[in-house]
Amino acid sequence: MSDWNKNLAREIAKGIIATGIEGGYDSVAKSTAYNYPSIGVSQWEGNRADELLRAIPGGEEFIGRTYIDIKASGELPMLKELLRSDAGKQAALEQLSRDCLQYVEVLQQVPTLDDTRCIIYAGMWCPTSTWVVKRFLANRYMHVDLRSLEALYKLFKDYYWIAADVGELYRAGYANRARTTYEYVAGIDLTTPYGVPAYGEAGNGR
């Protein structure tokens, strides 16, 4: 894996965290599918939640416990405090960056999606479904300029809710996510601290 990919992955992770589009550091909710908690900036569940907790001092206390048990015991505030501690924040960034590396590798298979900001933008949608995002873009690259952040924003705002098959109920929420993500990505400084070329300065648009 290249340093370029690692840097892109970290930028995507930082964006997901900064915007809170998947949740805050101390997000804790009852999983929709199980009785166990869904935690952190990417709503990790099961083994992924356990992985995060193991990386935080004191986190093992909560491994394998149901959401109801943690709440009934009055320990929910303690779990939240643990997740938003400095160690918790660092562990979340590292774990999310590893997840985002997979997003980058999948997105690089989409023709013409090679602009830095556009990869970051698309990557910030991948927690919804990496494969849906990939298919959504791969099916449209002939008709939409995937090297244009503005074009990508409009594409996701208007059509991604249909591709994701989430129903009309989520249409407004996805439009808000598209705007929030666009505003974040348009404003980030890509010249530091990793030396990633600024938007449009590299020969391939990166």
What is each model feature region?
Residues M1-T112, T116-I119, G123-R206:
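Cell-wall polysaccharide-cleaving catalytic domain and substrate-binding groove, primarily
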